[in-house]
Amino acid sequence: MGNLRVSSMLLLSLMAAASANNFHQDVEITWGGGHARVLGRGNLLRLTMDKTAGGAGFKSNRDYLFGRFNMQMKLIAGNSAGTVTTFYLSSEGPSHDEIDLEFLGNKSGSPYTLHTNVFTRGQGGREEGFHLWFDPTKHFHTYSIVWNPKNIILVDSIPIRVFNNEESIGVPYPNNQRMKVYASLWDADDWATRGGRVKTDWSKAPFVAYYRNFVAKSDWEMQGLSARGKKLLSWVRKRCRIYYYCNDERHGRGSRHPPPPECKA
């Protein structure tokens, strides 16, 4: 895997750098009270979940129409079953747009699951799930959402998913609602780990996740993946993807739930 760990700058074809923001100035704690704490000089934020508060969350003060959004995250170590740690973009209202990165906790020794989804005008159903090929609890990793009129690219140091704009064949695409950056830690033991069969072990609380070096670059470029990036994306799909909505048996022949149009293309 050493030779696969190329930088997201290479994968995304020389995106320009932006200055890291300050959590004190640039985000608002939305829930959880003291369970969300900005530390140090403002570049580190800690979310804590225990039984007194089922987690915490924050959102950016600014909203954006397209851009690149980076967040370094260090996830809950040990037995994190039942927990969900998130980094995502969302607009407001019932017809909202949303681009999700959700990290589903695990029992010690099992891989974290990364759940992704794209909502357009309140409609989702475009999930892809992955088992991470690294331990996201030992070190900080930079997770990026690249959103432009052409495509959505989700990356760590390797591209994880691409969702292309295919409005020409009737696929809804989020391109006209401004979105804010959100992050949260919460208890979802009714579904998060093995479909809810593994519950949160509150004796392991508090559960703690860290965020740092939030960067939002509000201008956009018609970015795509390089040839190297496409090869790495193919590797992730073959080796790490555990769920793909187009392959869901609910969309099989004769189903009442036909596959989305991009699955037929």
Predicted regions and their residues:
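GH16 jelly-roll
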Residues: 2-265
